């Protein structure tokens, strides 16, 4: 961040890679095949996998990334991208809710913002915005501001969300 931060207008901190069952890092949103390969032991325990993800996200939020530390946190619950494919449809358990609350309280204390975007709606195996309505409600109650974002990686995504 220190090397390139001065050349950017806006940065978003997000978690895309997580250590898998074999200790290697895998992209959580690349494909269902990679997700299955990486997180096989957790595929029957949605809340354990989500807890692993949110624990890593908390470390990222707490990390000192220097002068250009991103103010905004993107798709806080990206781990749910393939939720319908893997049957991850249960509500978050109490342990995950507590951890998310801790993350949001840290964000509030740091003056951070939560990126709010619709891209998950357009993912056929997700069909939910990032973050979920539940997390949005927690953030609102705790006073963490939302910033509308597109999180678009293509013109087509922008047109669908805002066109």
Predicted features along the sequence, with ranges:
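Extended substrate/RNA-proximal surfaces in nucleic-acid metabolism proteins
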Residues: 1-107
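Charged catalytic cores and adjacent phosphate/nucleic-acid-binding surfaces used
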Residues: 76, 86-163
């Amino acid at each position: 961040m220190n090397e390139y931060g001065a050349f950017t207008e806006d940065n978003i901190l997000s978690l895309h890679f997580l250590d898998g069952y074999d200790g290697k890092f895998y992209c959580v949103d690349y494909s269902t095949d990679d997700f299955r390969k990486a997180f096989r032991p957790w595929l029957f325990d949605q809340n354990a996998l989500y807890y692993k993800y949110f624990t890593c996200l908390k470390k990222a939020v707490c990390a000192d990334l220097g002068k250009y530390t991103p103010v905004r946190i993107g798709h806080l619950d990206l781990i749910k991208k393939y939720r319908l494919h893997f049957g991850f449809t249960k509500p978050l358990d109490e342990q995950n809710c507590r951890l998310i609350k801790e993350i949001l309280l840290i964000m509030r204390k740091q003056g951070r913002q939560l990126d709010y975007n619709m891209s998950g709606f357009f993912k056929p195996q997700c069909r939910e915005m990032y973050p979920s309505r539940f997390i949005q409600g927690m953030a609102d109650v705790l006073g963490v501001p939302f910033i509308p974002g597109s999180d678009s990686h293509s013109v087509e995504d922008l047109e669908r969300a805002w066109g």
